[in-house]
């Protein structure tokens, strides 16, 4: 494939491309500089190339083809010689170089011959250019293009001087036609396009080094646009078809209405018409019953005639009714025409078009508001709006449209929990601190009953119930029979306590034995104690109702307890260590008392185990209980006493102040 074939093929394809976009080649006045540049790249060479130059180009192609074939033969011979003899390689290479130099000289001579020939210009149609490529490698286009890219890379650039000659044709702007570059030639040759595909080239004309991916992308966009156009056209057609169908439906409905109305009217007329009179059968000829004025010879009256066919007596009123029906039909036709116009253009609608607004503004400039029936004149000019609508539109200039209420978006995500307390002030100021103090006072939980409040307004809580409401009960302590078991238990404890104190210094071994025996006895009796405790718990659960305590009950309990423990234990007769034998019931009662105070102290046996039997502690507890009972009585007596001006209660200050010799002022 020759160099000139590439160039001519590129020009041809570029010529077709521009021909589709610019049909009028000769009209260059209305074109921009960019449009002219495209034309100068393609069309000017065709106008300036002559017929003789075209013939010489054909000869040049034939000569160059023969040279190309000789080069291929020389290369094949050189390859064979290289395999046989290594010494002959240098000679063959020199021969090949000489042959190549000769070919280059021949090419230069051919170019010089083209420059010497100058003839008159002719039209493009008379020019003949061989655009068909010549293949050397069995018709493979890709292999041929690779050869020319490698071998003839320097010679593809062809100037316009070699093909066209001088002088150039200049434009008014002084724009010269630039030559075709190597990239443009390779692009136009590689693109084998038809006239329908030239719209795609617009994207690649300026930048030829685009990738195949971008080309496919551009083609897809081009196809999408075509699909969108087709869809839009189909939608328009569908809308037109729907409009036609609606019109046909309306016509049919109108025709049906008219037919129904006609039938109804005919039925009504038949019902309203009176029965027609009949003449006598004897008079079958026309008769005249009118009064004739003899003076004027004019007929004044009604002419009655008789139909022989139907025997009906007819007047001239039927013709008038027919005329009225025709007039009504014409009125209906006019109304139907107006309905069609109303369907197409929404008459008396609240929406205003630009034409209606312009008409309204035109008349308002001509008329004055003081004119009679001002808005009626405006509506008459607008034609599609009433006077009220025109006035409403004019007054709407001063009104701002309402903004649509934005709906709150319901967020699916859980929001940040906010506190119900709103604090707008700065918390570091005095006002903010006061606000915080109020909030804390309101939010912090308080007790319902304030025990330390000395005022009467607060509700008091009675921790001990009044004596009137107490259920009277018998003194349970007096009726109890402790029996001999409890006395034996008290004596046994004291005996053990004294024995251990006497024998500490004399016999250590005996102490150990006694301790072991006591421990064993205690361990054996724990089981009995547990059984007794379980029985006591069951009895307590059965008696769920709590017994209320009376003052007499406390006093009797104190007397019995003081009289029982005031007696001293009997003296010890023997000093020797003896193991006292006690019954199981006495040991169980002892261990019941033991468990309340010494659950974990098994090793401290030498200590006195029972603090309840101390006389001093028992007296103190009795005194406290007696004070409580006496104060309860005093409190009930003072409930109805008067309150001081300050509202303070004397009870919380220890009764009357006069007893202590103190005044109210000193208390404060």
Curated annotation (Swiss-Prot):
Residues 308-318, 642-651 have a biased composition (Acidic residues). The lineage of its organism: Eukaryota, Amoebozoa, Evosea, Eumycetozoa, Dictyostelia. This is Myb-like protein W. Residues 344-398 form the Myb-like domain. Residues 69-121, 293-307, 501-542 have a biased composition (Low complexity). Residues 246-268, 319-335, 632-641 have a biased composition (Basic and acidic residues). GO terms for molecular function: histone acetyltransferase activity. Residues 57-124, 246-357, 403-432, 497-546, 561-583, 631-668 are annotated as: Disordered.
